[in-house]
Every structure is written in C-alpha cells, then in structure tokens.
Amino acid sequence: MKKLLKLFSFVLVAAMCIAMCSCAKTGLRSKPVDLEHVMPLLMYVGCGDDSGKASQPAFTDEELQQLTDAGINEYVLLTTFMPTYYCDIDENGNAVGEPQRLCTKEDIYTLTAEDLGLESDSEFDLTNAQEKIIRDSYVTPADNKSTINQQIDYEIELAKRILAINPNAKFWFSLPHTKIIEGATFYAEHYMDVIYPKVKIAFSEEEFEKNVGGLYWSTEDAGGNAFDVENQVDFGNPAVKAAKYCSDILHEDNKTLMWIPYTSAGRQYERIGFISNLTDVFDYVYMQPGYLWHAEKEPYVGYIKSSVEAGAVLNSNGAIYGGEKKSSTVIGVEIELDRKVISGKEAEAHMTRYNAYVENFSQFKSDKLIAIYCSNSNDMFVETVTELLFQWYK
C-alpha cells in the first residue's frame, strides 16, 4: 500500500511539474477570464510632439457634456507623442531630478543577437546592428526634454474633468509609442514606474477600482525582426515582451491592456493573429481596417468582420492564426471617422468607404465589440461628424 501511495505521489508531483512547465511556456493567464465588453471613444489629449506643450486642441466642458449625453462611458486617452525622456517621481507623483532617457545607448548595447532577430552570432554583426539602431532611432529632440510625466498629467486632467460630469466613465491611459522598437522593454519598465503609479496616485481607491479600466498600448504594430511562432510566451519579439511586462502588472490589479493595431498585408496582420489568439498579453484588440483613408485596404473590412464574428483573428482563407483561439482576448474593430467624410475633394469617396463600416460593423454595436476613432476635438465636433459618431452609441 505504501509503495502504491509513493507511486501515486510521484505521478502526481510529476504531473504538476509538467503542468507548471506547460503554463510557463505560454503567454496566457493562469486561468481564462470573461472580460467585460467595452466600446471606447479615442480622445487625443496633451502632447503632439517633443515640445511638452498641450498641442492637441482641448475639449470644452460643453463638448464633454455632449459625449456623456450621447451615452459614451468608456474612453481611451491617447497621444501622438513619441517620448524620449522621463523623470523619476516621489510618493505624490511629482517629478524629481533631471529628465532621463527612456532608452540609452548603453541599453541598446545590451541587446543580444536573439533580441534583434539576427541569424548570425558574430560580435561584428551584433555591434553593427546595435549601431544601426543608434544611427536610425537615437535622436536628440529639443532642449526642453519633454517627458512622459507631462503627457500623463494631461490625460489625468482630462479624465478628472470627464468624471466631474460623468461619474460612471471609465478610462484607459496611454503608454506612448516606443520610438526605438528594439528597446521597447526599457520603455515599458519606465512606463510602469512612472505612468501607472501616477494614475494610481491621482485617483481615490474607489475611483481607481471603478473608473480606471487600465492602459492603452500605443505602439500599433509588433515590429522588429524577431518573431518566433513557437515561442508562445512573447514570440521573442521586443514589442510583445514589453507589452507583456505591462499587462502582467496590470492583471495583478485586475486591470486590462488594450491594443488597436493597424492592419497591412504580410507579417503585421499575421502577428496580430498569433498574439491575439495565443496569448493574453492584450485583453482587448480592436483592429484598424484603414479602408477609410486607403481604398486598396477594402479586403480588410471582410477579414476583420469575419474575425470579430468568430471571436478570433482569421487569415484571408478563414483559418484561425495559431490553429485555435486559446486566449481570453476580446476581438473587435476600430471604426475610423473624421471630417474627410464631408470635406475635401474626395469627401464622397470617403463617405462611401465609411458607409461600408456602417454596413459591415453595425452588427457589433450591441455586443460592444467596437472602438471609435474620430480624430481630435476639432474634427469630432464638426456637426455632421458628431451626428455620425453619436449614431454608434444609439
């Protein structure tokens, strides 16, 4: 009997070890989650460049009231800002010390051949690749050294203004675009040391629980050479590694990471599929058709429609990338809208393409599998554009 018990114990421990090793080799949560569906409006706020100034046009209180009256409760606060600097923060979220680089030359020289997706292991090739990144991407912006601290302050300010009007609003704050994609993990570490703590500090415990949905990953692609489909933790890709670092922290607080990637032929669309179907790095993935501005992207309307219907990213033949949907990721579509549908030489063509969105994607309104892009406040509150926007929330 004792021998049988020992044998059973051995088998049980071995099975647990195998299970743990198996889990360790995926980018999935420890168990599936059923995520709330949300239908966010994207709102530009704050910095549009390295000046540190709020170059995006501000929303008026009257405009924020109109958004609330239209039934809009979820917002992504975003920026076109591609930052270079950050400042450390104190316990109150205030910047301390001088601005520092998010990714330094020293950081770049720590990147390995595997990080860079190099086939060669030679030191010569690695050094050349590192120095090419520095030449191509390591730029020095204006002397004012605007920081991620300034941008998140603008986002928090707008969120508080919306909350004063709509106490049920929920927000996703931006993790700005990574200027040096190969060094994305360095950006991510500083983002989660500065941006996320500042959000936590800015809101009461009750507000953080109720009104903060999470963060928005602004880098719209999974660039870089490295992408190993056999590595279903992060594919060895710098952008996915960085995003996973952020989402792991968010998931500990029951918060989510949102991604709205652009679609294009070739590896970008394929990568969206593998990331979305096989990992829980991103909790919400709303794919951009791009058709509103690019007539040649019409096929993506059909691809995305089929994917949202299936709840998994499908290839052009209708097959699931990765073979099956393993993740809890919510798959949706971004509706693109701006004043080009009513003004300019190609307004009629833009409106025709916009109507294709209405025809193909309106079915997803009731399940809230839609995010809405409507440019900045200057475009959003042009009369006809506003009416078209609000139709999605009726």
Locations of regions flagged by a protein language model:
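N-terminal catalytic cores of secreted or lumenal carbohydrate-active enzymes
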Residues: 28-190
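Extracellular glycoside hydrolase catalytic/binding regions
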Residues: 191-195, 211, 222-242, 247, ...
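Bacterial N-terminal signal peptides that target proteins for export
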Residues: 1-11
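Aromatic-lined carbohydrate-recognition surfaces of secreted/lumenal glycan-active proteins
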Residues: 167-193, 212, 216-217, 246-270, ...
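Substrate-binding cleft of secreted/luminal carbohydrate-active enzymes
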Residues: 72-74, 78-79, 83-84, 210-213, ...
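Bacterial N-terminal signal peptides
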Residues: 10-19
